[in-house]
Amino acid sequence: MKKLTNVLLDGKPSTLLFEGDRIARIETGSAPLEPGDIDGRGLTAVPGLVDIHAHGCLGLDTMDADFAEMAVFRAKNGTTTWLPTSMTAFREDLERVCAAPRDVPGARLPGIHLEGPHIAMSKKGAQNPDCIRMPDIDELRSLRPAAIRVTIAPELPGALEYIRAAADMGVSVTLGHTDATYEQACAGFDAGASSLTHTFNAMPGIHHRKPGPIGAALEKGAFAELICDGFHVAPPIALMLYKAFGPDRVALISDNIRPAGAPEGEYDCGGMKVILKNGEARLPDGTIAGCTVTLWECVRRAVSFGVPFADAIRMATATPAAAAHLDAGVLAPGRPADVLLVDLSGPLPELRTVVLRGDVFA
């Protein structure tokens, strides 16, 4: 049985034993190395990251319906499970994405996150307005079982019925690209939604007389996706969200788009022109288009903002996995053998090794 030994797990010397691509058991203390074993070199072991909202990278995009190269990029950068996330697009394009092979080398792909197309025109952000349409549960059925998470604006006609039906199918429903009032968002959560999509972005903010979707999520115990790059949400506000919701309800996401990991220039993202300049991706009118740093870098930035490392890791592993109903993000017997080895000797954590499916990947 292969093992990963000489690691720190929750601060204690530990050994993880693998059977196939799963953890068989975890033992206290280090063990002698045998051929094929992995030497953790005294580094800290944490679960592989879980990104439940990521569109593209390297000039590629989920809408291309080819995930192989992107999955390798994710894994090399510490994300071992991810949900390729669609743009708001026409039904035939979404069907093509949901039919694309997901059994590829690299990060695990348990399903697709549909960001739209049932969103508010007033909060479309970088989504293509020509593809926005009213809720249609038959369309969602046509995209199952690949579609396992969906973003919707709860104030749209028919949205609550859609949310109930989606939740009954086991789909994780998240409210986003919405102009909903507090009351409308509460109704969405009561109908079965359980998250906010990229909290603060493409939705009303918190006002002392209009708490809006964020106030509703806080009241209803929902999860809150957060792009923690310091650009989409100011660091003090990101820290405020963490303190208000806690690490068990804030799910860090990359929201990576096509230009992530690619040179500066112009890109087509879901039919929208996006310009990457000085590390920021925007539409020609200045609208923020998406994030270009990895989820691991979001973890590092969360730590730099004042979030304890253990909480930052939880917000990028167990919490997003729970938000999207995924078997990932936890190191325990029977769970995926996806492990990051991290050096905590400096001011910020450094990723040293990625173990994916029980083998060293990067």
Name every feature range the model reports, one short phrase each:
Residues 3, 44, 48-50, 174, ...:
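Residue-level marker for buried hydrophobic side chains located in beta-strands
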Residues 1-32, 355, 359-360:
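N-terminal metal-binding scaffold of metallo-dependent hydrolase/deaminase domains
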Residues 114, 166, 196, 302, ...:
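Conserved, mostly hydrophobic/aromatic
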Residues 143-262:
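Active-site core of metal-dependent hydrolases
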